């Protein structure tokens, strides 16, 4: 039976890899909705190839360019919607059974909530939705009775390992991290690294923001918070280990101390496919893992001096309330400034820490959506206000 899906962030890394899955499995999936930011050329190609029923382009001023780019499709005309509201329309579009949330950052929160409220199952590739919005997202998931399935490699690995583990059987989660672009760089050299240096990920092909998050290890810190919300373990039972080969995507320890792991080549398509096909397993012709070719697998403790963002994430997670939303927004804004070469690499954790410290007195244990969104905006403003004052010298 063909599953009808919509993709939020179709021109990004997650979106294009999801569409690659659809291309190889047309008997399993049909695209009914696409939402993208402003990449007209790529979105036009996707519209022509997959012929969705509804298409959103967030940058409304580019709608006419998009229509012109697909003008030769005289036998087909989708419904066009624009702006943030248009993305929400795609998220809740009636004919889709599942929605892949590939929008980067907290911008994915409201569309994901709209999809959940419309009764759609979620293939969650946007971790910020849970990190910032868990206090409102999780009750909505329970109310609507939808499935919230992890589509990133680490949480998919945990989810796969948990199949068959009885309730209460999970003892510890071990998240693996590649270590990012600077895993082998002496910490003394970090003040001198450039944007180009930070974007050279050793293992994965990802978007710019998540690649920087990998270099700071904030990506793993955010995944700790996401794992807490998805799987219900407290932070003392969620660990991070550096695994340079990125073959083991994460592990779980069960009550008898047995450890289960999910292995595979670094390929985001596998967790995406599993989130869309669960509980089934769909045959693929992708290159299977060859353990001899993979060679030795190594592990080491993260360097806390090199990766201060990791502990900032643990601290925000333990604080709870709207603090994870503040952490996430501060990180998004700081990373954006770094990518614009307005701050140094080491200014990223400095700005995040200062912002979180300033929010402590405002935090509330059970924030509503309005409070979460206000905290997000406050954190972004605070980072911008303090960015001119950070110590950028080596």
UniProtKB/Swiss-Prot annotation:
GO terms for molecular function: 1-deoxy-D-xylulose-5-phosphate reductoisomerase activity; manganese ion binding; NADPH binding. This is 1-deoxy-D-xylulose 5-phosphate reductoisomerase. Its EC number is 1.1.1.267. Keywords: Isoprene biosynthesis, Manganese, Metal-binding, NADP, Oxidoreductase. Its cofactor is Mg(2+); Mn(2+). It is an enzyme of class 1 (oxidoreductase). It comes from Synechocystis sp. (strain ATCC 27184 / PCC 6803 / Kazusa). Pathway: Isoprenoid biosynthesis; isopentenyl diphosphate biosynthesis via DXP pathway; isopentenyl diphosphate from 1-deoxy-D-xylulose 5-phosphate: step 1/6. Belongs to the DXR family. 1-deoxy-D-xylulose 5-phosphate binds at residues 127, 153-154, 178, 201, 214, 219-220, 223. NADPH binds at residues 11-14, 37, 39, 126, 128, 207. PANTHER family: 1-DEOXY-D-XYLULOSE 5-PHOSPHATE REDUCTOISOMERASE, 1-DEOXY-D-XYLULOSE 5-PHOSPHATE REDUCTOISOMERASE, CHLOROPLASTIC.
